[in-house]
Amino acid sequence: MTYLQESSRPAITVPKLQAMREAGEKIAMLTCYDASFAALLDRAGTDVLLIGDSLGNVLQGHTTTLPVSLDDIAYHTACVARVQPRALVVADLPFGTYGTPAEAFAHSVALMRAGAQMVKLEGGEWLADTIRFLVERSVPVCAHLGLTPQSVHAFGGFKVQGRTEAGAAQLLRDARAIEDAGAQLVVLEAVPTLVAAEVTHMLKIPTIGIGAGLDCSGQVLVLHDMLGIFPGKRPRFVKDFMQGQPSIQAAVEAYVSAVKECTFPGPEHSF
């Protein structure tokens, strides 16, 4: 048995994401952690596969992403990359792995050797030097602003960011700083719709929203969440795409279509 993908569709690359943004084509991203789902998500037309530290929640059972290790991310990145998907493969740098530019580079190299084509790290202005250091060394970077789960204890919980005038101004400064440093993509999580729209219109790089409204260049959800596999209360920004669908692939195709056609997220999924 092989999960190697044979697709006539061109591969999604970092320049392709930029071209999609400029053409007004929405980008559909989902988290992915193994070969089986990598093949399925790729067939369904997902543009970006994110090996997220959310695996600490949905696979390992932790209440936060903080216990996830670099080895964990590298292992799951290799599982996804072996499929050779058309989708771009992005891997999270876990908590505590990018305290200095040199440390971030060494750990990014490990993830890229495992098959990542881009790394994601959480933070704004304070990370500009690190982002620049990585980009200068041919490591494509996705930044993550707003509700950054690795900062859950600093935030005092999972809270919407950028609601105050000062908070929104800082988010705009962060966005400008990471773009100026060379980031090629940015995730905006749990950010008020109007603020996310302002960031999206200000930047030249694509923005990927999760609980950040419809104006972003694309959307991302945790795979398990969009399939309705979550314990307890469903997060506001999540829609269960499995409802009414005959298969997981049909559910993923429905998600991709909803993102591309701008029918997701709705106001009920935004702040």
From Swiss-Prot:
It catalyses: 3-methyl-2-oxobutanoate + (6R)-5,10-methylene-5,6,7,8-tetrahydrofolate + H2O = 2-dehydropantoate + (6S)-5,6,7,8-tetrahydrofolate. It comes from the Bacteria. 3-methyl-2-oxobutanoate binds at D53, S54, D92, K120. One of its GO terms (cellular component) is cytoplasm. The keyword Cytoplasm applies. Binds 1 Mg(2+) ion per subunit. Mg(2+) binds at D53, D92, E122. Gene3D superfamilies: Phosphoenolpyruvate-binding domains. Disulfide bonds: none annotated. Pathway: Cofactor biosynthesis; (R)-pantothenate biosynthesis; (R)-pantoate from 3-methyl-2-oxobutanoate: step 1/2. Pfam families: Pantoate_transf. The active site is at E189 (proton acceptor). Keywords: Cytoplasm, Magnesium, Metal-binding, Pantothenate biosynthesis, Transferase. Its cofactor is Mg(2+). It is an enzyme of class 2 (transferase). Belongs to the PanB family. Catalyzes the reversible reaction in which hydroxymethyl group from 5,10-methylenetetrahydrofolate is transferred onto alpha-ketoisovalerate to form ketopantoate. This is 3-methyl-2-oxobutanoate hydroxymethyltransferase.
